[in-house]
Amino acid sequence: MANNLISTPQSFQALKASLNESTYSTKKNLTFEEAYTFVSDEIENDKVAKLRETQKTTNFDKVVKDKAYYKENFNFYYTLIKNTLLSNGVRVYRTTAEGKVTLMDFDESARDLAASFVGWDCLEDAMNDNSITDIYVISWNKIFVEKNGHNEVYHKIFRSESAYRNFIERILREANKQLDNGENKIVDFELYGNRGNVVNDIIATKGICLTMRKHAEDPIKLQDMLEHNLMTKEIADILGTVIEGETNIIYAGITGSGKTTAIRALLNYYITKLNKRALVLEDTQELFLSNPHTVDLTTFPTDDPRTSITLRDLNISALRMKPKYIVVGEVRGAEAEAAVEGMETGHSTIFTMHGGNVWNVINRLVTKYLMQMPSLGIEVVERIIGEAINFVCIQDDIPGIGRRLTSMHEIGYDFEHHCVTATPIIIYNFEKSDWDWKNTLSNDVLNTITRRGVPYSRAKAINETIKKNMENIK
């Protein structure tokens, strides 16, 4: 593995095994800031730490900075810092918000110092809490988190504004990015499997603004979605059948609606059983499909367009790799045209997109396509898109209710009236807190999924299920 480019000497392992708090006596008490400075100076002169930092610098582009790397690196410095505290008889004390002075034990001191030195600083608890999905730092002393779907004030803040600035600079450096007053006033980055966005304080008036979206350690499964009533088993099976039938699907919603989580669960449950080849194209790897025959491709952005690999490049390349499924993490720009081209060439294409309703999605897709191919004209582009897409699903995160698949439309093109059509299949009824079943699938869709391997009896059973539910509503 690439991470093995950074080695841990045997002498360090022996040091780790020898740590024993009972053999040391306290020689001095330091504030956390004093201890941070003291530890920094000690580590700067430590031979093992110097070797490690040299290896990190030498192999910067080869080291995979994933969660495993983070954990190993954190534990390395935690052990080194704890030894530094113990061997020098240093105890760390903190003053609480109420003015109370408390001594920290060696373990707590070492962990908090390691978090400030190489970790997530005061956000470490949030990063280790699986119930927290998003972190919002408005300023150094005002932090919110999204926990179990609800926003709440975080229980910690950064030590100072300067400590927060140093933290931002450090994590961006680890991600090979920088924040400045020039071209990099707003920076998107990925680090240790998590996505982040930083906005400079010349734009964010309350101070540097940081938004973190955590990658889930244990991805939500289809059964979890059903238990939380995101959709019913009947709806999931209809989606699963049209996925198996290699149709073209856009799974859309606003930011934070859980569209990526939902499409991952659906694909993992239904595609994995099919033994079909899938290509996953993403800017930042998020889907992590469990299907064994999956090729994961990510973009490679650079300042030079000649060496960059964009989502559009990946889409075009994917057409030559004989996929059964092309799954695009999110379509937001020029890749829209290439994704639709994949649909037109007969490759099942499934992607997520931002949009509040089905027409938002169609309009955005038409606009993105026209930006890439302006000479075609809007009528031609609408015809291409209407013919290429089979379904648009919309998911929402509804206050007081939770995440719901709120609509599923079959998409087509009306050649007589020259317009895209969107026929509702299911619509979430807020008054009943249940789904209304509106229309059966068209014969064109049934024929498509049958040609792609779904037995006709199963294809027909979908419409029987829909008809039954439509009658129950009446």
Question: Where does each model-flagged region fall?
Answer:
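P-loop NTP-binding catalytic core
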Residues: 137-138, 142-245
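N-terminal accessory targeting/assembly segments
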Residues: 1-180
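NTP-binding/hydrolysis catalytic cores, primarily Walker-type P-loop NTPases
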Residues: 407-474
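Residue-level signature of catalytic and energy-coupling elements of molecular machines
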Residues: 135, 198, 346, 389
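Hydrophobic anchor at the beta1->P-loop junction of P-loop NTPases
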Residues: 251-253
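Walker A (P-loop) phosphate-binding loop of P-loop NTPases
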Residues: 256
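Switch/coupling sub-region of P-loop NTPases
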Residues: 247-249, 261, 265-387, 395-397
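Phosphate-binding/switch region of NTP-binding enzymes
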Residues: 383-416
